[in-house]
Amino acid sequence: MADNGDAKGGSGAYAINIENFSKRLKVFYDHWKEHKSDLWGSSDAIAIATPPPSDDLRYLKSSALDIWLLGYEFPETIIVFMHKQIHVLSSQKKGNLIGTLKKAANEAVGVDIVLHVKTKNSDGADLMDDIVHAARNQSKSDKPVVGHIAKEAPEGKLLETWIKKLSGSGLRLVDVTNGFSELFAVKDTTEITCVKKAAYLTSSVLKNFVIPKLEKVIDEEKEVSHSSLMDDAEKAILDPLKVKVKLKPDNVDICYPPVFQSGGKFDLKPGASSNDEYLYYDSASIIICAIGSKYSSYCSNVARTYLIDATPTQNKAYETLRKAHEAAIQQVKPGNQMSAVYQAAVAVIERDAPELLPNLTKSAGTGIGLEFRESGLNLNAKNDRRIKKGMVFNVSLGLHNIQAETTSEKTKQFSLLLADTVLVNERGHEILTAPCSKAFKDVAYSFNEDDDAVAAEVKIKSKTIDVMPTKATLRSDNQEMSKEELRRQHQAELARQKNEETARRLAGVGTGSGDGRGPARASNELVAYKNVNDVPFVRDLVIQVDQKNEAVLLPIYGSMVPFHVSTVKSVTSHQDNRTCTIRIFFNVPGMPFSNDSKFNSQGAIYLKEITFRSKDPRHSSEVVQQIKTLRRQVASRESERAERATLVTQEKLQIGSNRMKMMRLSDVWIRPAFGGRGRKLTGNLEAHFNGFRYSTSRSDERVDIMFGNIKHAFFQPAEKEMITLLHFHLHNHIMVGNKKTKDVQFYVEVMDVVQTLGGSRRSALDPDEIEEEQRERDRKNRINMDFQNFVNKVNDHWSQPQFKGLDLEFDVPLRELGFHGVPYKASAFIIPTSTCLVELIETPFLVVSLSEIEIVNLERVGFGTKNFDMAIVFKDFKKDVLRIDSIPSASLDAIKEWLDTTDLKYYESRLNLNWRPILKTIIDDPQKFIDDGGWEFLNMEASDSETEDTEESDQGYVPSDAEPESESEDDDSDSESLVESDDDDEESDEDSEEEKGKTWEELEREASNADREHGAESDSEEERRRRKAKTFGKSRAPERSSFKGAPPSKKPKFR
């Protein structure tokens, strides 16, 4: 027997929820009276006979009524509802349980419960006669009408006897199935809660168990049968803790055995099953998964289709089905006819792919609840019933037996299926299984992304058919092809795509204006006193500081003249013998670095400097200190005001319900920290309907982060670090205290600072040491789990339809791809994520969106170097190039592999480049940049693959601010090019042979003679160095050494 709700009445192991029973019994009798003639067949009594228990999964109206009304299924029990009595025929134990409801039934609807207890060996015939006699007596008709469920065939001796008694009693029998369908259609709050829990379990099993299981099987190329996957998924449903769902196993069950289909054999009917064939995951294969689970007997369902190296036909069919499915769900709202749901799907198919209309399923699903298929709520083209608030639907849509363009028996025909559990509410609908994404990017797997390549780096081989000889031949042919060669081919294609993309972008680029500064306050706004009467009276003509009005009062010609402290540029004091000199400098137009736009009264006369002498050194130092302090306070306030003026107005935070307040992290720190001199406090981070709120116990320490302002969200659990953190990188700046920032982080330190008072060094096997380490591990695991639970809840909230356009999901940095480098001033461990390159432990934080990167140039790459640098060029050429310096050379191959995997074009160079003039030249003359080959001027290997005839034209684009002085300079420019050819190497080798054995002095003497022969005898050593430095400033490479044994020169580094 399945428990449905909290037990509040009865005794023993089972107890019936009396409150639910009273409420639902009243609903049942009211519905019977209101719809007696149309839905209940004008019945005078309604007889429900529940068959014996069965191991088979089945859905019966009689069992559904037992669970709905009593909370349990009562097998081999007959319940007859009459207008004044309820007769129950059952065993002694069941009768005792139902007997506890007598008072509740009388109070709810004024009926008496009459129990008929059947002995173990009796067929109950005599008790049945009593029930039939009572039905006759309570009816006003000569031939009473008794409603029953006609489709349920009698099972067992008791029910067979009951049907014979009814048939031979002269009572008229009518089918009341439609009445029960309508009764169960609209769910109350308790039922909706059960459906939501079931849907959460279903989506968690698919998302956290089934998908990782499939990915592992495919990745490891295992032979796993559909039936084996079915068994594993069923075990995951029955043990919710496996998928991190905290539901009691006693309350959960499967709606049907999980369905896995692939290999061209598909059945989209609700009663489909998984066969014993192996999962087929070769190219162009389709995998259909359907999962259904129950909580307290209430059903939920989800179905997804996964595509492996899909063909264009499969892509189009899936996208069409997805749009049709979403269109159908959009029509699930109160007041609509159920036929409108199916018609919306048909309209999408007719518009986007009319050839697929014959393949569309004949229904868009059914109602779901205590029964997996509530037949009265069929979402087909003929059902004109109205959708009501509280109904729950399994919106299921499929395309079956579509012909593909492949010849393989396993892939020439395919089917697609999508299903979601949808609740009808006052706002329209809620997709309860939304955490399971059906977006194409989340269900399509590509293991052969480059169709033009000779061989794919990752190849999924078929495990269900013999490998063809041609495939084996290709693999053997490609054994000599290294990863480097594959990467080089991919990078060449990326270079072509990147140059085309850059050309398109530069063709439409516009020049920005302005310096990005916020509005400055004009000088006429800086008013200390509105009129003369407000100036305080001062008896002594000495310098005074008015803190309240932010003014400095200076004695000039016998009067106290006020100056707003913002007009003061600086103040100094100097003591000479007994005299102190105070000098005050003011902001005036025309000074270097001054903003003249602040001075509106251009014709006015401004005081630039004033000097005072005093014989009171104590007063002089006090005045200077007061002016400096007041000026600093006002400057800080004005700076904060200017920063706030540049902020983008955010939407207002909508405080969530009590259920949403459960999404909360307690006792977390924030970075950047709030200002102020008080002790720093931890706070609470709460997720609300449209944003986060962080607050401490101080009322002025509060930060709101709107979901719409979040560009990237990261969750980094503590592994080798001391903190577990959540980090938000924003689209627009916000203020945290008085700091303007785009990065906000919340963290908890996972290790406590412990100081050993004994002072002696403890052994590694010391029990206290072991206990302390275990305590630290437990604390770290507990904090990581708390953060993980918070992240999971927020991700589920973000998966709702209203946040779909934000594309938000917490990203976890991939530590195995991380590397050390210096992005700012100190070395840090930099980690890639799926969308970014981040460093979130040390400040300032580093967050680089991969989508904003134009190219990456790996600099100082060469043999013998211990480290190299990475220059990241952004698509916005006005943005400074980001440099990450001193990356260990051991990380080079891993970084190149990561860049290639993420489709980022990278180049390598032997020296650092001066990127500012390069980008300026590109912006000033984009057409020349495009004509000269785009980014290929960075390609060191370009000259290796070209002939001598085209060598000069293929040197690439070398930006330069200087014009060539003569043709001779152009002729000699090969030795200074960023791209060095093999010819240079050969010349160097020849020169080395000629010069072998000569000393440094001989070489220097020969060089001087050669200079004099060329008319350059006037050039001094200093001039030669200056010309050489100038050449390097144009981002040209230094000349190679023309002899062996020369000491390696230190390569200058330009930013």
UniProtKB/Swiss-Prot annotation:
Coiled coil: 313-333, 480-503, 768-789
Cell location: Nucleus; Chromosome
The keyword Transcription regulation belongs to this UniProt entry's keyword annotation: yes
InterPro entries for this protein: Creatin/AminoP/Spt16_N, Creatinase/aminopeptidase-like, FACT-SPT16_Nlobe, Fact-SPT16_PH, FACT_SPT16_C, FACT_SPT16_M, Pept_M24, PH-like_dom_sf
Gene Ontology biological-process annotations: DNA repair; DNA replication; transcription elongation by RNA polymerase II
MF terms (GO), sorted A to Z: nucleosome binding
Name the UniProt record assigns to this protein: FACT complex subunit SPT16
Cysteine-cysteine disulfides: none
Physiological role: Component of the FACT complex, a general chromatin factor that acts to reorganize nucleosomes. The FACT complex is involved in multiple processes that require DNA as a template such as mRNA elongation, DNA replication and DNA repair. During transcription elongation the FACT complex acts as a histone chaperone that both destabilizes and restores nucleosomal structure.
Subunit (UniProt): Component of the FACT complex, a stable heterodimer of SPT16 and SSRP.
Family annotation (Pfam families): FACT-Spt16_Nlob, Peptidase_M24, PH_SPT16, Rttp106-like_middle, SPT16, SPT16_C
Biased amino acid composition, Acidic residues: 943-954, 962-994
Keywords linked to the UniProt accession: Chromosome, Coiled coil, DNA damage, DNA repair, DNA replication, Nucleus, Transcription, Transcription regulation
Family: Belongs to the peptidase M24 family. SPT16 subfamily.
GO cellular component terms listed in the entry, alphabetical order: FACT complex
Spans annotated as Disordered: 492-519, 942-1055
Residue stretches of biased makeup (Basic and acidic residues): 492-504, 995-1017
